[in-house]
Amino acid sequence: MKRAPTKQPAKPAARGGERAQGRVIAAHGRHYIVAPADGGSMLQCFPRGKKSEVAVGDRVAYERTSADQGVIVEIGERRNLLYRSDQFKSKLFAANLDQLLIVLATEPYFSEDLLGRALIAAEANELKPIVVLNKIDVEAALPVARERLAPYRALGYDVLELSVKGAPDDARAQLAPRLAGHSTILLGQSGMGKSTLVNLLVPDAEAATREISAALNSGRHTTTFTRLYPLQDGGALIDSPGFQEFGLYHLTEGRLERAFPEFRPLLAHCRFYNCHHLHEPGCAILEALADGRIAPTRHALYAQLVHEASQIVR
């Protein structure tokens, strides 16, 4: 008499050693928080090997090593990648972005150098840049801020004027449609109102930060990690600290010159094909600088970035 076949139990999902898919939503050192693609609880992951090449926003494959930990075994193809860099090293920190949102304010006085660098990063990575001028209710400082931003408006950059604290509903109405469905990196100096803006757009941001901080074992007061917040209308907001460390040392000179939109129509008109646009005769960029078509501050930024890039060994 034949025995009835034994019924096999259902196969459990994502057990230890089995691969699963997810997205990196926070990073601190070599510690990463991954949100599983199937909607399960987030887990702390570490990269396989000594070198850490993972960025917030990466789509990854991971293998669980315990109920709440895993190891990242593969990184999906990236659309783009942003770096934080100085002359000694470059560290990737955000990937798969659509937009770059820079928060400025009427006061304190914002750094035009940092604004310029952020815009160059956006152009070099084909991200849509959005400039926010916050605290427009500080009326005494508003005319000067507008005057400083006028050259950027003339270059075609969006500048949104709002007051996150004074008129939060208006701020949300301006920003929400622009962020919906897109992955946006948020940058801003201290004092510009970036944290207030995050809390406006992501109501549970503080709770999420505490949860991620605890999961990273980085201390309850630690907020110096890049993190991704899903948005209610789709898309995501990536908040990264340390705007001052934002560098462009990894860009080649060719990518750098094309990241200035006012340079691009002129590049083919320089006398020399390998023109550096610094002191060469017959340079179309220098001619445009001399007759006022290119702002001196923009060319000075270009020259500074070329100098910085020349100081490192590639």
Curated annotation (Swiss-Prot):
Keyword Hydrolase annotated: yes
GO cellular component: cytoplasm
Keywords linked to the UniProt accession: Cytoplasm, GTP-binding, Hydrolase, Metal-binding, Nucleotide-binding, Ribosome biogenesis, RNA-binding, rRNA-binding, Zinc
Cellular location(s): Cytoplasm
Pfam families: RsgA_GTPase
InterPro entries for this protein: G_CP_dom, NA-bd_OB-fold, P-loop_NTPase, Ribosome_biogen_GTPase_RsgA, RsgA_GTPase_dom, RsgA_N
Signal peptide bounds: none
Matching Gene3D superfamilies: Nucleic acid-binding proteins, P-loop containing nucleotide triphosphate hydrolases, Probable gtpase engc, domain 3
Binding locations of Zn(2+): 270, 275, 277, 283
Entries under NCBIfam families matching the protein: ribosome small subunit-dependent GTPase A
Subunit structure: Monomer. Associates with 30S ribosomal subunit, binds 16S rRNA.
Purpose: One of several proteins that assist in the late maturation steps of the functional core of the 30S ribosomal subunit. Helps release RbfA from mature subunits. May play a role in the assembly of ribosomal proteins into the subunit. Circularly permuted GTPase that catalyzes slow GTP hydrolysis, GTPase activity is stimulated by the 30S ribosomal subunit.
Protein name: Small ribosomal subunit biogenesis GTPase RsgA
